Amino acid sequence: MKIVIVGTGAMGSVYAALLADSGNEVWAIDLWQEHLDAINDHGLQVSGASGERTVRNIQVSTRAADAGPCDLVVIATKASAVGAAARSLTSNLTDETLVLTIQNGLGAGERISKNLDSANILLGVAGGFGASVPEPGHVHHNGMELIRLGEMHGGMSERLEHVAKVWQDAGFNVKTFADINQLIWEKFICNVALSGAAAAFDRTLGEVMDDPVTWEIAKKLGLEAYRVGKAKGIHFSFEDPVQYISDFGSKMPKAKPSMLLDLMAKRRTEIDAINGMVPVVAKEQGLDAPYNEAIAAVIKTKESAFTN
């Protein structure tokens, strides 16, 4: 399969390395020239959960157009860059090309569908999956639990199963689901509660949960998102969202979520797609979400210290 991966930071680099190492033709597209040059000159070094290896058959470019038509596009950018990534794909798409987006938060599929045919969009949810880039040309894979895939408009299909098989053959634990939006929302409420609080208060997930004050705020954040999802018609697999969030966080108490890592590195976060999205969807449902409005404002204030 010919695969174009747009956004080869930490997660995208893991996708590129494993998919290329299993025999697919993979193009890595990114604006980080130093990283691309290192991959081109020395291969992409992988360490950690998926094993030690150097993958040398990845083609790189700063322009998606250089890759030409392909079978699958994987958008692995930050949530804020999804729309721009979709607009860059004109030369990569045929009637059969599938576009898979794996992001935190809500709305990635909708942003892509403003530019591309939504009938060819697949959505993914990565769980227990972490990575970092210690230096250009080197990705460290912290963990790999499960990638869930589904059709944007629901249901099962042969093409969905085929894409899943390609990822499974590359070493990923992948399952397909008829209602991927349920799974996106279930991860979303955990990110809203724990990532939002961790980023706002500069805590690991365990520290958020151990402090009665921050844990109470985290619970309020998650409950707001849960109520909004229920109003929107999401069929959650659980009745107790607080217990679900607690179970999620307890699996990785030392984790620093991506929004906190972004703030520590003085980068823009994905707050608009996480806590900032809750009030937006709440308003559509005739609800409000004051805790998430407040946390989003706190994190945006932190961002303003280094983005203005």
Regions found by a protein language model. Give the residues of each.
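NAD(P)-dependent Rossmann-like dehydrogenase/reductase catalytic/cofactor-binding core
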Residues: 217-308
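Rossmann-like NAD(P)(H) cofactor-binding subdomain of soluble oxidoreductases
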Residues: 29, 53-138
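Short, well-ordered alpha-helices that flank and scaffold nucleotide-derived cofactor binding pockets
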Residues: 17, 21, 87-91, 114, ...
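Internal alpha-helical scaffold of NAD(P)-dependent oxidoreductase catalytic cores
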Residues: 92, 115-120, 135-192, 196-238
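Short alpha-helical
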Residues: 34, 80-81, 106-107, 155, ...
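Active-site-adjacent beta-strand anchor residues
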Residues: 5, 29, 75-76, 102, ...
